[in-house]
Amino acid sequence: MGSGMSQILPGLYIGNFKDARDAEQLSRNKVTHILSVHDTARPMLEGVKYLCIPAADTPSQNLTRHFKESIKFIHECRLQGESCLVHCLAGVSRSVTLVIAYIMTVTDFGWEDALHTVRAGRSCANPNLGFQRQLQEFEKHEVHQYRQWLREEYGENPLRDAEEAKNILAAPGILKYWAFLRRL
């Protein structure tokens, strides 16, 4: 959790509160946009575009209502060829949940494959049970409309995210490793 931000897809990173204030690391990864999702989320650095979502890391916190604005923020950043850091305090639950919703929207992945994609880049990724339930509901009832909205709003995705994510999951041993961990 303290080893720096993790690249999930090209131009998309997950990190913690400390990473979001590390100007050198942000510059090195060409981060121009930061999505902060924690109790005291607010802009902290000059020259960075922010989306701040005040949210607690509790199972009762509704993150679903922030999916659309988060997806729009991340996608517009990446379409401009820039990089976005999504962070909460530890970079484990809230930020991971928003990135999973984004991956589900830009690919045909369900929430579990999207989680495995995130974990391939950030092994500590672990949305709380309430957020997992919200992602399951998003998969069942809303993700298809979000995919359609994204296509209508931005056209076909030139970022090749589905291909990138499938390559991540196809890496030797990734799914076997996560299946093993699930049994523990």
From Swiss-Prot:
What are the protein's GO molecular function terms? non-membrane spanning protein tyrosine phosphatase activity; protein serine/threonine phosphatase activity; protein tyrosine kinase binding; protein tyrosine kinase inhibitor activity; protein tyrosine phosphatase activity; protein tyrosine/serine/threonine phosphatase activity
What chemistry does it catalyse, as a reaction equation?
O-phospho-L-tyrosyl-[protein] + H2O = L-tyrosyl-[protein] + phosphate; O-phospho-L-seryl-[protein] + H2O = L-seryl-[protein] + phosphate; O-phospho-L-threonyl-[protein] + H2O = L-threonyl-[protein] + phosphate
Tell whether Lipoprotein is among the UniProt keywords.
yes
> Gene3D superfamilies attached here?
Protein tyrosine phosphatase superfamily
Q: Which Pfam families match?
A: DSPc
Places the protein is found: Cytoplasm
Result of knocking out the encoding gene: Enhances T-cell mediated immune response. Increases susceptibility to experimental autoimmune encephalomyelitis. Aged animals develop autoimmunity and inflammatory phenotypes, including raised inflammatory cytokines, anti-nuclear and anti-DNA antibodies, renal damage and splenomegaly.
Q: What is its main location?
A: cytoplasm
Post-translational modification here is noted as: Myristoylation regulates subcellular location, and is necessary for activation of JNK.
Known partners and oligomeric status = Monomer. Interacts with LCK; the interaction is direct. Interacts with UBR2; the interaction is direct.
Full protein name: Dual specificity protein phosphatase 22
Q: What is the lineage of its organism?
A: Eukaryota, Metazoa, Chordata, Craniata, Vertebrata
